Amino acid sequence: MTKETYFEELSYALRRRELLPRPLEEDGLLPVEWNGRILCRVTESGAVRYDPTWVDTSRAKAALAQVTEAAGTVMEYMTLLENAPPLKADGLADGYRVLAEFNGTVLAGTETLLGAQFVTWARDYDRSGVNNGHYYMEDYQGAREDFALRSGLVARERVFDREQLEGLRQAVQGLSLIHI
């Protein structure tokens, strides 16, 4: 993966988070603007550089955390896409790569003009094709979670949805208040 490819994909990811990547600087760093000022700079290896005086509020710290998470995630999946084997399946357009495969379930990705996109599929009985695609577009994390559930790596019964987690949080807070 080239520096340009990484920064282009990272720029897509940052814009989706309402952060503004600026043109590359002479030193090869990608500046990221937030709230009308430069928040940090990202290196081609995915490291995030910043001056602590720039991150002086909780909102600025949250924005910096988003940049750091995006830089690491994009580096992870771009490296995977670069090294992954092509997905061979009857009737499937070229360009998809196998990021993971387990128990008849495939996590695949492809690079498009609008950035990397991800999908999970079930393999056909004879493993010559794929079907029942769950398309996650640019949501790499969502595709990974779906792969873990569909493939059986994680049992559905052990995963809480947001509503269940909120109920647990409220119950724990209620217990904390009772015992104070």
Language-model features and meaning:
Residues E33-Q66, A70, V74-Y77:
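Long, continuous compositionally biased terminal/linker segments
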Residues E76-Q117, V159:
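Short N-terminal "domain-start" leader segments
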Residues S128-Y140, E157:
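A short, exposed loop/beta-hairpin motif centered on an aromatic-Gly-Thr core
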Residues D139-S151:
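A short, charged, amphipathic alpha-helix used as a generic interaction element across diverse proteins
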Residues E157-S176:
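Amphipathic alpha-helical oligomerization segments
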Residues I178-I180:
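Conserved small/polar residues in nucleotide/adenosyl-binding loops
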